[in-house]
Amino acid sequence: MMRFTIIVIAFLLIIQSLEEEHILVYAHEGGEAGHKSLDYQGDQDSSTLHPKELFDAPRKVRFGRTTRAEKEQVTAMNNDSWSFKISGEHKQTNILADHDTTKNTFCKKMMIIVNDLTSLPTLEPSTSTNDMEKLARLLRDDYPIYSKPRRKPPVNNRAPDKF
């Protein structure tokens, strides 16, 4: 479970760093200043074809992408289980996460402070040799489909030529 949370944390950190560098492109009307989005920004190539400044009307964005981006924004705002604050000056990452500290369903919020991402434990595959043998047996062609082998039918139900 800890490895899974580390993978999720790393993935979310990568996404956040891409957002800060304005690499990710969002499909929503009226983004932040200097932020790339699919609404019309009045670039030089198409300014003569669709002059936004003259009509002052936003470009119509495709319906599916807009709603998907808005849903992702709403779920990101409503998601209380993860919150990140990255401070570039201190090179410190504060991660707030729900962490199950007891056997029952009681969860408390705890803060994990990671000074350097290299200090996280290395991710190793969690498969043992026994699991690998089971997987190899499942992937073999001669592995039976059913868990129990079929038994021979009783003598009175066999075909006449099988006696």
From Swiss-Prot:
**Gene Ontology molecular function, alphabetical:** growth factor activity; hormone activity
Annotated Gene Ontology cellular component terms: extracellular space
Q: Which UniProt keywords apply?
A: Differentiation, Growth factor, Hydroxylation, Secreted, Signal, Sulfation
Say if the entry is tagged with keyword Phosphoprotein. no
Carrying Sulfotyrosine, the residues are 143
Q: Which residues form the propeptide?
A: 21-141, 158-163
**Designated name of the protein:** Protein GOLVEN 3
